[in-house]
UniProtKB/Swiss-Prot annotation:
SMART domains reported for this sequence: Arg_tRNA_synt_N, DALR_1
Species of provenance: Methanococcus maripaludis (strain DSM 14266 / JCM 13030 / NBRC 101832 / S2 / LL)
GO molecular function, one term: ATP binding
PROSITE patterns: AA_TRNA_LIGASE_I (PS00178)
Lineage of origin: Archaea, Methanobacteriati, Methanobacteriota, Methanomada group, Methanococci
HAMAP family: Arg_tRNA_synth
Subcellular location: Cytoplasm
Enzyme class per UniProt: ligase
UniProt main location, coarse: cytoplasm
Name of the protein in question: Arginine--tRNA ligase
One GO BP annotation of this record: arginyl-tRNA aminoacylation
A GO cellular component entry from the record: cytoplasm
Superkingdom field: Archaea
Gene expressing this chain: argS
EC number: 6.1.1.19
Length: 566
């Protein structure tokens, strides 16, 4: 039974009866549960039409309503507050979670295909923490959209045709790869050294341009030769390292789409021709697309006069392919790509396609300062994770919960993944963030360890409990801590729905912390195993069991596992 929707429907009927008009009604939640579970201010909105004081309207409405699942309705200073029957509500909530188990929070299947592109870092060095923000938000959003019923395909767009990759291919001829290092790190070292070489020898720049041109010509002609093999090997070598990092963080892509595919298939040439026929292309030192009809002053560079394509044209071809194979597309991009993303979208619109949705994220840094791949000064995601694991292992040893170094390693890895992923995803993407260790590995207030520890506590309580009797569950006067946690647990499906709808995984992250904190208050104030009243004890065990399920299901939406012991 959806009590909230029942209240809204009843209020809408009441308003129509009073005024003859429809009214959009939204319920608020009072700050404390003793003030009610839901509240509405409709009396203030009705005052003008009914020519009565809000206080009187609220009292009249409160006295006239009877709603299934609502124990009492109070009018307070013009507001109408609704109090649920927690005995019935708790039984229903616990029963639903217990029955659905790992499926609790998942919504009905929709007949809609989504292509979600995230990460898509250039294969010229290891992921830095800016890429980390992209991949964590992207993977969390994927999981939330799947739980919300969408058919989701995640894609990684591989830039194998840009200047950066030509520098890597050129550098591989000049410098030896360090095979003792992780592949993407070895490639990164070559990239940095090659950039230094180019800075000192400007005449070598022409060789980079020749590599780019010759690779594109080979791709366009459908030729496989020594050069295409060099590009393919360099990219795949980097991707091997990337996939290791992604796997460590529980991130998986369904498809790696290479930029060159669209040149080989002839689609890039087709896109250029279609755009030429729009009458919106102007020629100066290059071909540019005039998007002023869409309020964009800057022109989009489409191709060089010699006909060779640019990243933008290949990106448009990629987006057309996406749009032809899904109901909607979502891209994760850094805020510095805003103008480019708008230009690509308006080009799609010009050609008659839907625009892609874009989730932009702001810069992320460590307190030590910023990052730069080109100069080689940056913090890689691998280093960030290893540091998190080292700090987590130290904490696990201090707490004495593991029996062996192997177990310490296993627990520390899960804590580290949680610390990195959760600390990134809890912050709204549009806000710049500083990754702080005292927050990421906080066991007391805001870090993922708070949530994982609440789960470990649930596991410990249930360790020796064989079964929980359903007889007379919640047939007593529940206290505020019990009511609060049960109400929180019931919200997961709506949280998933909302987070998917607005594409904001931080909603899920904030919710799961609320659940953990709500459970900790319940644990501190409500004896479970030591409770003498069997009805109360079984009811509280049911709360512990369903809290464990909700914590597992919710952290799974964020790609985070439970250590079990902490």
């Amino acid at each position: 039974m959806d009590v909230e929707n029942l209240i809204i429907t009843t209020l809408k009927d009441k308003v129509k009866g009073l005024t003859g008009n429809e009214m959009d009604i939204r319920l608020d939640e009072p700050p404390a549960i003793n003030m009610g579970d839901y509240s509405t201010n409709i009396s203030f909105r009705l005052a003008k039409d009914l020519k009565k004081a809000p206080k009187m309207i609220a009292e009249d409405i409160a006295n006239s309503l009877s709603i299934l699942g609502i124990e009492r309705i109070e009018a307070v200073n013009g507001y109408i507050n609704f109090f649920m029957n927690y005995s019935d509500f708790s039984k229903e909530t616990v029963s639903k979670i217990s029955d659905e188990k790992e499926n609790f929070g998942k919504l009905e299947k929709r007949n809609e295909k989504v292509i979600l592109e995230h990460t898509s870092a250039n294969p010229n060095g290891p992921f830095h923490i800016g890429h980390g923000r992209n991949m964590v938000i992207g993977d969390s959003l994927k999981r939330i959209l799947i739980a919300s019923g969408y058919d989701v395909e995640t894609q990684y767009y591989v830039n194998d045709m840009g200047r950066q990759e030509a520098i890597v291919v050129f550098g591989n001829e000049k410098f030896e790869l360090d095979n003792s290092k992780k592949a993407d790190h070895a490639i990164g070292e070559v990239y940095v050294e090659t950039n230094k070489l180019l800075a000192e020898n400007e005449e070598l720049e022409q060789e980079i341009l020749n590599l780019m041109k010759n690779y594109e010509s080979a791709c366009e002609a459908g030729i496989e030769n020594e050069l295409t093999e060099k590009f393919k090997n360099a990219v795949n070598y980097s991707l091997g390292g990337f996939k290791e990092t992604l796997l460590t963080l529980n991130i998986y892509h369904d498809k790696f789409v290479w930029e060159s595919e669209f040149v080989k298939s002839g689609m890039v040439r087709e896109v250029i021709n279609r755009l030429m026929n729009t009458g919106k292309v102007v020629e100066d030192e290059v071909y540019r697309l005039d998007l002023s009809d869409y309020g964009i002053e800057k022109k989009l560079v489409l191709a060089r006069l010699n006909g060779t394509s640019l990243y933008s044209t290949r990106d448009i071809a990629y987006h057309i392919t996406k749009m032809e194979n899904c109901d909607f597309a979502v891209n994760l991009l850094g805020a510095d790509h805003k103008l480019t993303a708008v230009m690509v979208n308006k080009t799609l619109a010009l050609l008659g396609y839907n625009e892609a949705e874009v989730v932009f994220y702001e810069f992320i840094s460590l307190p030590e300062g910023s990052m730069s791949t080109r100069k080689g000064r940056f913090i890689s995601m691998d280093e960030l994770f290893e540091e998190a694991k080292s700090r987590a292992a130290e904490e696990v040893r201090k707490r004495g919960v593991a029996q062996s170094e192997e177990e310490i390693e296993e627990i520390a890895k899960k804590i580290a993944v949680g610390a990195v992923r959760y600390n990134i995803v809890r912050i709204a993407p549009e806000k710049p963030m500083v990754f702080r260790w005292d927050e990421a590995l906080d066991f007391e207030k805001v870090g993922c360890p708070v949530i994982q520890y609440a789960h470990a506590r649930c596991s410990r309580i249930l360790e020796n409990v064989e079964n929980i009797s359903n007889e007379n569950l919640f047939a007593y006067d529940m206290n505020e801590n019990e009511k609060t946690i049960v109400k929180l647990l019931s919200k997961l499906p709506k949280i998933v729905e909302k987070a998917a709808e607005v594409r904001k995984p931080q909603i899920v992250a904030n919710y799961v912390l609320d659940v953990a904190q709500g459970f900790n208050k319940f644990y501190a104030n409500c004896p479970v195993l030591k409770e003498e009243n069997e009805t109360v004890k079984n009811s509280r065990l049911a709360i512990v069991s369903t809290t464990k399920t909700v914590l597992e299901n919710t952290l799974d939406l964020l790609g985070i596992e439970m250590p079990g012991k902490m």
